[in-house]
Amino acid sequence: MAEKKKKRVLILGAAGRDFHNFNVFFRDNPEYEVVAFTATQIPDIEGRIYPPELAGELYPNGIPIWSEDDMEKIIKEHDIDVVVFAYSDVSHEHVMHLASRAHSAGADFWLLGPKSTMLKSSKPVVAVTAVRTGCGKSQTSRKVAQLLQEMGYKVVAIRHPMPYGDLRKQVVQRFATFEDLDKYECTIEEREEYEPYIERGMVVYAGVDYEKILREAEKEADIILWDGGNNDFPFYEPDLWIVVTDPHRPGHELKYHPGETNFRAADVIIINKIDTANRDDIQKVRESIEKVNPNATVIEAASPIFVDKPELIKGKRVLVVEDGPTLTHGGMKYGAGYVAAKKFGAAEIIDPRPYAVGSIIETYKKYPHLDVILPAMGYGKKQIKELEETINRADADVVIMGTPVDLRRFMNLNKPAVRVKYELEEIGQPKLKEVLEEWAKNCEKLKK
């Protein structure tokens, strides 16, 4: 009998979900041949190779990473049978336009779901995900970690991947000290996610091979905390699934992929930022919950800001630096730094655009909705340097850092800086603590 022809696959990604889907579904599957990955969202990832050490025995030369812009050309030149969509925080319309492009070039278009991609853990998994980037996952994850620790559990966090460097050195990364961040040459985006855990004395894992990461984390954890990325769904099967929504972007919970998946599957839905959102917009989110997930437990919360030196802001001309991804593909116009500038009486929030250099200029061209905010873009050493130069060139009295990471750890700034932090605070009932206690009481894995 003639050997069955392998299906030729192209995976559309952004150096995260795509690698995971490959590892768990395609890597050892002889029925498929993954011809290439494509890249978008993250600067400078196309042109790399997914290395043979990670790609497995079927791929002795590794797998190339090309630009998504060339999708139709790749489908035709390489006789692609199946295009697999594998990244997040995009509108449903964006996904379907890609599907139409794939179909018009002759290929099938797939979305792999939880059954094909979620790994099972021997330990209980609490997952924190969101409907969009910038909803408040980070402070929610921190709060969940703190509450579980106070209940006496050893919690280990595992963060959705951000593999921007040499993938071979990043198979399994364990962060317990600030030195570990330097050891793995972390970008600003990575530091923003890992530092808050380290500051709390916690261990956080990340990397490329999430099966290996899980098995390492299980050795030292009572409970695994999945800290999601963008609005993606978890890589691990959750025993408790918490999803954060944002009433500043009402309706997005049903319009963005795969955030709607999270929203529909959630055990607990947090409506965050209710202290700063419009009442009608909060109501729209509530109506969405009633419509598609009426059995979810709903918690209302605020994310109040705390500033280390508010006296430096009053009456000053300030440069506001905000979390990069929230403003770029998250689509927000401002973040915590802007709120702090207004709240503490800055005389003026300066326009950083005239002072931008290098790739920061390109960021403003790509995201024209940004005006008086400087997004903390730092996907590599060169970009971090360009961000530092932009900040130092800016004609301002003070820098307000609305970023989760303290930029002064790895930048020399020529003006005083104020750091803004934000924590999750529930409003009314139920509280997260009660929800977690009730869950822990009934969790079979914790009884073992």
Swiss-Prot record:
<keyword id="KW-0067">ATP-binding</keyword>
<dbReference type="InterPro" id="IPR027417">
    <property type="entry name" value="P-loop_NTPase"/>
</dbReference>
<comment type="pathway">
    <text>Amino-acid biosynthesis; L-proline biosynthesis.</text>
</comment>
<keyword id="KW-0547">Nucleotide-binding</keyword>
<dbReference type="GO" id="GO:0016874">
    <property type="term" value="F:ligase activity"/>
</dbReference>
<dbReference type="GO" id="GO:0008652">
    <property type="term" value="P:amino acid biosynthetic process"/>
</dbReference>
<dbReference type="Pfam" id="PF02492">
    <property type="entry name" value="cobW"/>
</dbReference>
<comment type="function">
    <text>Arginine deiminase involved in an arginine synthetase pathway, which provides citrulline and ornithine, the precursors for proline biosynthesis. Catalyzes the conversion of L-arginine to citrulline while conserving the energy of arginine deimination to generate ATP from ADP and free phosphate. Is specific toward L-arginine and cannot use D-arginine, agmatine, guanidine, L-alanine-L-arginine dipeptide and L-arginine-L-alanine dipeptide. Can also use CDP, GDP or UDP, with lower activity (38%, 8.4% and 13.3%, respectively).</text>
</comment>
<keyword id="KW-0436">Ligase</keyword>
<comment type="subunit">
    <text>Probably forms homotetramers and higher assemblies of tetramers.</text>
</comment>
<protein>
    <recommendedName>
        <fullName>Arginine synthetase ArcE</fullName>
        <ecNumber>6.3.-.-</ecNumber>
    </recommendedName>
</protein>
<comment type="pathway">
    <text>Amino-acid degradation; L-arginine degradation.</text>
</comment>
<keyword id="KW-0460">Magnesium</keyword>
<dbReference type="InterPro" id="IPR053199">
    <property type="entry name" value="cDPG_synthetase-like"/>
</dbReference>
<dbReference type="GO" id="GO:0005524">
    <property type="term" value="F:ATP binding"/>
</dbReference>
<dbReference type="InterPro" id="IPR003495">
    <property type="entry name" value="CobW/HypB/UreG_nucleotide-bd"/>
</dbReference>
<keyword id="KW-0028">Amino-acid biosynthesis</keyword>
